Amino acid sequence: MLARFERYPLTFGPTPIERLSRLSAHLGGKVDLYAKREDCNSGLAFGGNKLRKLEYIVPDAIASGADTLVSIGGVQSNHTRMVAAVAAKIGMKCRLVQEAWVPHEDAVYDRVGNIMLSRIMGADVRLVEDGFDIGIRSSWEQAIAEVKAAGGKPYAIPAGASVHKYGGLGYVGFAEEVRAQERELGFAFDYIVVCTVTGSTHAGMLVGFAKDGRERRVIGIDASATPAQTRAQVLEIARRTADLVDLGRELSADDVVLNEDYAYPIYGVPSAETKEAIRLCGRLEGMITDPVYEGKSMQGMIDLVRKGFFPAGAKVLYAHLGGAPALNGYAYAFRNG
């Protein structure tokens, strides 16, 4: 599906699939849980899912003649960390807009974790007080204009790389990679669980798994707390990506499976249940998830198993997208573990 698209390699190769045997047993042993470790995909600044997307965006950035990558996210954005890492790797400058997406007041929130790593890698980081929104942001457009005005050649990468024209391609590749691994494993996964916010990870998976009829087996766990906007953006990106890769069929709103039950209380703020899911996964599997994204999708998967959403004998693949560096910004919440 992706053969005709240029890809700039930023990852080690196919990410490993790990059986979560102790977590599965703890939850009753009727459902087999596995994790695809996107959090271990690269040596670039702790890796994560955004690198899969950026592999298909970097060739376009280089071809454009740009000298500065310009992107946006929250203060503890994993995406902006990855953009900073990629800029360093390919020899470009980086301008980052970090908006106040999360009403979180840990004393060191804007000085540790992802934002600290971006600064270490040389990004020009600007803090902006605007609140959360997954759409196109005026602060980002202003940053692009400022780079131009200073004589630079900006290349614009939206939040999460999601509404970029190539933003969905990387996770079409994820689906193709899973199919190859399934042949080696000798079975196919019945469900894929993924955290959904800006939408292109879910959308790319939806398109990729639509090739073998599993588009509605991709279970998005909303962490945006703005599910209507997120659902619409996933569908828009999926349709555009399907056209790009010649999927050959129309995708409908019903193809976007998005569970809205675990994003509370608000984007970026973990509930008691999210924190307990983070602890449970860490203590049973040594697998670290974060309070913003993966903790909520882990909470969702655990709860769905407990409620019997997955039938007995189902094999469920949890897409671990990364994000652990953000935990540093939540030190007080986990001060006792």
Swiss-Prot record:
Needed co-factor(s): pyridoxal 5'-phosphate
Gene Ontology terms for molecular function: 1-aminocyclopropane-1-carboxylate deaminase activity; D-cysteine desulfhydrase activity; pyridoxal phosphate binding
Originating species: Methylobacterium sp. (strain 4-46)
Function description: Catalyzes a cyclopropane ring-opening reaction, the irreversible conversion of 1-aminocyclopropane-1-carboxylate (ACC) to ammonia and alpha-ketobutyrate. Allows growth on ACC as a nitrogen source.
InterPro entries tied to this protein: ACCD_DCysDesulf (IPR027278), ACP_carboxylate_deaminase (IPR005965), ACP_carboxylate_deaminase_bac (IPR020601), TrpB-like_PALP (IPR001926), TrpB-like_PALP_sf (IPR036052)
Enzyme Commission no: 3.5.99.7
Protein name: 1-aminocyclopropane-1-carboxylate deaminase
Complex and partners: Homotrimer.
Primary enzyme class: hydrolase
